[in-house]
Amino acid sequence: MRRLMLLPALLALTAPARAQVSDEALSGAPMARLTQAKDYVLRRASSYDRTGGNADYRTIAPGETLTLMDEAGPGVISHVWITIASPEAYHLKKLVLRMYWEGETSPSVETPVGDFFGLGLGNYFLYQATPLAVGSDKALNSFFPMPFQKQARNTVTNEGREKVAAYYFNIDYRALSKALPADTLYFHAQYRQATPCKAIKGNGLNVEGHDNYVWMEATGRGHFVGVTMSVMENADGWWGEGDDMFFVDGDKKPSINGTGSEDYFLGAWDFSGGPFAYAWFGAPVRGLELAGERWSVYRFHLDSPITFTKSLRASIEHGHANDRADDYYSVAYWYQTEPHAVFPALPPVEERLPKLHPPGAH
């Protein structure tokens, strides 16, 4: 959006139709059909104290991978709750969450824990959206439905230097007696970053989005349902002049082209009204337009997910025509058939930590 005024600085499963679970078990729609009998049994994978005591947590040593859940299907994860006690700064960036479906060795979810819940700069703040929320105090919640037919395995790895003193978790899932519908798609979440983005000093035109910041790339059939993103400004000025661009099924030019970063995240005019957090969109952290300032934003396409039958490349410009070199951190969320394309390698832990990169200093 061009400013007109100065503003402050899932593999499709082939179960027989006669043995399918209802759509309601997959939907997760609150208060929908509460008067009707359910066709699932609610189960929970949890850190509770098996001795009957009150030590309802796990510790995680440096380098250790803790299995949070390893359950047979069919089922649907309906809610994930986590809270963490750790002495280490930026532990939200140093703990890595992974989720695997159907015995795959390549994770369908791979992201630092904080980033998965929209805390992309490694610090806690409170907000409430429909699929994700952070409650008081430091309570991380996900309500994304995550179906699995044969197996669901979730892990967390401590890539920090300090022992996690307490990692509490509850993973609620619906154990099903019948197969999932044949067109069921699997949940995916992918972390990306650019620290910094590479500024392009060209003619101010960007038609094909070659140098855009990429949220995700996928092959197969599925639909994109949203993104959380955090920005650290490396120079004064407005970071969000860049347009969102979605390339569906190999299109060379954007299938969907936006008008500005704050417009995509459903704000306007540089988010000048201040921070906000709504059910499907928000900017819960809004800085000034100055070097070193931090921003966090999110958008969920729950009304009309962006569909693809072969491939999708979801991206956004970093500044107008990619003319800025700020630091971007993001997690994209989507559903698709399995197998999925292997994700890019997760950056080393030290590279994931927010730090200022002034122009000319890198």
Identify what each model region corresponds to.
Residues 5-14:
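Bacterial N-terminal signal peptides
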Residues 1-2:
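N-terminal secretory signal peptides that target proteins for export/translocation
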Residues 15-19:
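Sec/Tat signal peptide C-region and signal peptidase I cleavage site
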Residues 20-362:
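Beta-strand-centric surfaces of beta-sandwich/beta-rich domains
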